[in-house]
Amino acid sequence: LFGGLLDKLREKIKKYCNKENLDKACSKL
């Protein structure tokens, strides 16, 4: 259950990072 939530959250963050081009903040993901 928890792992699935983390995966969804990570996907949202990746999409946001791609949209906003926050390379430094998102390279850690």
UniProtKB/Swiss-Prot annotation:
Tissue localization of expression is: Expressed by the venom gland.
Keyword Oxidoreductase listed? The answer is no
Which GO terms of the cellular component aspect does the record hold?
extracellular region
Subcellular location, record wording:
Secreted
| Domain of life according to the entry | Eukaryota
Sorted alphabetically, the keyword list is:
Disulfide bond, Secreted
Q: What does this protein do?
A: This heterodimer may have anti-inflammatory properties, since the myrmexin complex (composed of 6 SS-LS heterodimers) inhibits carrageenin-induced edema in a dose-dependent manner (after subcutaneous injection into rats).
Summarize the subunit comment: Heterodimer composed of subunit SS2 and subunit LS1 (U1-PSDTX-Pt1e), and heterodimer composed of subunit SS2 and LS2 (U1-PSDTX-Pt1c); disulfide-linked.
Family of this protein: Belongs to the myrmexin family.
Other noteworthy facts: There are 6 heterodimeric myrmexins which consist of a small subunit (SS1 or SS2 or SS3) disulfide-linked to a larger, quite structurally unrelated subunit (LS1 or LS2).
Q: What is this protein called?
A: U1-pseudomyrmecitoxin-Pt1 subunit SS2
Q: Which organism is it from?
A: Pseudomyrmex triplarinus (Ant)
